[in-house]
Amino acid sequence: MGRTLAEKVWDAHVVRRADGEPDLLYIDLHLVHEVTSPQAFEALRLAGRPVRRPELTLATEDHNVPTTDTLAPIADPISAAQVEALRKNCAEFGVRLYPMNDPGQGIVHVVGPQLGLSQPGMTIVCGDSHTSTHGAFGALAFGIGTSQVEHVLATQTLPQRRPKTMAITVAGDLPVGVSAKDLILAIIARIGTGGGAGHVIEYRGAAIRALSMEGRMTVCNMSIEAGARAGMIAPDDVTFEYLAGRPRVATGAAWEEAVAYWRTLASDSDAVFDREVVIDAASLTPYVTWGTNPGQAAPLGSLVPAPADYPDAAARASVERALTYMGLTPGTPLSDVTVDTVFIGSCTNGRLSDLRAAADVLRGRRVSEGVRVLIVPGSMAVKAQAEAEGLDEVFRAAGAQWRSAGCSMCLGMNPDTLRPGERSASTSNRNFEGRQGPGGRTHLVSPAVAAATAVTGRLTAPADL
């Protein structure tokens, strides 16, 4: 019987297999940031162990860093302590670190791909759930906990139980104006936040193949919001063109050899998935979340749902709680919902193509009065590229704030937060209660929808401007 892409990568990395025990996997790349690593390094220190493969480990400061005055000391003492601990630990254990103000600094899931570290057929881990981003390259990439971070630092291996596999085929072509973010929100709305639990999702079909690498990263990034262990897309010429010439990618004969191997990384025609889902791309429109989990999403042209629309008692209770928290009334057009803040950035949508999409909407327009707009590049390299193209001038002319790189308003762990009761249109990946600050209300959208919303002050598709 044939094997799926996930099974091929998994099998190639099994160091030890025994009945009744998890497989022991070799890890090709370990990404590290300041929040989930301090205890892991301290455990190594107490045990007198080195980092096993420091050359396969890369660290960056992203979660806690400010995006305005990056030369001043970090004001929050806990955040400052975590950043300082990462610097100390990387220096002591010989791990390459990209600190604040370094040209290479940025969100860990933006930095890895832009350096060419994320490659097809690899196993990639990080103490961060959105490690699934790197699956866009045909890598098996997943988040791990702090104790597992220690295990990988010490051994470059990780015990893991073999996951199930799921195929999500997006048939046909996406309509004009529908982005990768709209697609993944629609997928999560369809299968639910637990729909991928215990599975590695492989995204397939014409619509997936038509996506750029950055669009593919957006889709794989939010696999975890569907409950999946990881998300993957088989590598193809789009992948190879993206990787060619990047700093950490082979050249010459070694490159040709790598590409030849990467071309074998596709699910066999007779591979059997544990679950299969088909999505009709042509039926999709811009999507937005209305509730407090990413599965509570709907087309932007629809109405706020009512609890009575749901047959299950638990679902009705969840919807009622979400509407209460979000301050929404059933039957309200989603396009009538006003916002206080727009955030464009994050490891989901903080890449150059995302900023270009936002700039295309904002060019020649002004931000609605009273709306705060934060545009935060995913890395300092993305920031430099955007400025070279003049995108920062477009944003400033529109009345938006152009920031330095970091996780920013994706999560309430740095100065960029919502105040209680404030409502945002956000290109990030989670809309949980308090995710962007205590009492903050978050609507997940694409960069283009976020930019259009900034112009009108209410949830808006660019086509409606």
Swiss-Prot record:
InterPro entries reported for this sequence: 3-IsopropMal_deHydase_lsu (IPR004430), Acnase/IPM_dHydase_lsu_aba_1/3 (IPR015931), Acoase/IPM_deHydtase_lsu_aba (IPR001030), Aconitase_4Fe-4S_BS (IPR018136), Aconitase_4Fe-4S_dom (IPR036008), IPM_dehydratase_rel_enz (IPR050067), IPMI_cat (IPR033941)
GO molecular function: 3-isopropylmalate dehydratase activity; 4 iron, 4 sulfur cluster binding; metal ion binding
PROSITE patterns found in the cross-reference section: ACONITASE_1, ACONITASE_2
Transmembrane segments: none
Cofactor, how bound (note): Binds 1 [4Fe-4S] cluster per subunit.
Top EC group: lyase
Gene Ontology biological process: L-leucine biosynthetic process
Alphabetized UniProt keyword annotations: 4Fe-4S, Amino-acid biosynthesis, Branched-chain amino acid biosynthesis, Iron, Iron-sulfur, Leucine biosynthesis, Lyase, Metal-binding
Binding residue positions for [4Fe-4S] cluster: 347, 407, 410
Keyword ATP-binding: no
Protein transport recorded as keyword: no
Cofactor: [4Fe-4S] cluster
One Pfam short name: Aconitase
Region (Disordered), start-end ranges: 416-443
Role summary: Catalyzes the isomerization between 2-isopropylmalate and 3-isopropylmalate, via the formation of 2-isopropylmaleate.
Family listed: Belongs to the aconitase/IPM isomerase family. LeuC type 1 subfamily.
Protein name: 3-isopropylmalate dehydratase large subunit
The gene coding this protein: leuC
